[in-house]
UniProtKB/Swiss-Prot annotation:
Domain of life (superkingdom): Eukaryota
Organism: Homo sapiens (Human)
UniProt-annotated location(s): Cell projection, Cilium
Name of protein: Ciliary microtubule inner protein 7
Record-linked InterPro entries: HDNR (IPR029369)
Gene that encodes the chain: CIMIP7
Any GO CC annotation of this UniProt entry: cilium
This protein's UniProt keywords: Cell projection
Amino acid sequence: MQSALVGSWHNNGFYGHYRSQFKSESAREYHLAAKPQPPAVFLQRCQEPAQRHFFSKHDNRTSFDKGPYCLLQGIGRRKDLERLWQRHTFLRWAPCEIELRQQGPLESSYQADFRPGPGLSGLPQHLIHFVQVQPSHTRTTYQQNFCCPSQGGHYGSYKVGPQAPVTDVLPDLPGIPRPKLLQHYLHAGVSECLNWSRALNKDS
């Protein structure tokens, strides 16, 4: 009868409601008798002395956290200790050795190409002076009659030629009427503009 009850009930984490406390206390004897037996490996380990227990490195991963060799043990994952010891230790670090092993030439390509010489002739790449190229302009009859050619040979509209005055070619065009400026607007500086009322009083 006792062997039939073993393993028929196990604690699943629910202890019942507080109102069913009397009911759970009455079933405590059944729970103790019906709980499953521990594994045979656990029972054998309990019978052995503690000095013979073999703990893994994962179990002892927090035992030597403050020591100098804390980086050598695999924390949370397995690592090859021989390869790890060759790569980096507390005194030898892997990135520094990799940089020294894969170190390139001490002279850069820029230093090899552009050496300090006596002048520009020593440079492999000669400097090309900038030449300003003017765009091509279309020539019109107005530019031919009223404008003089510029330095580049193109006709511009900034300089009026003296050989063809505008008044002789177009004498019948009326002049543009411009409003006559008052006297108090014809001052040379800002200080004179502040005293424009005095100038009007003198003229009056």
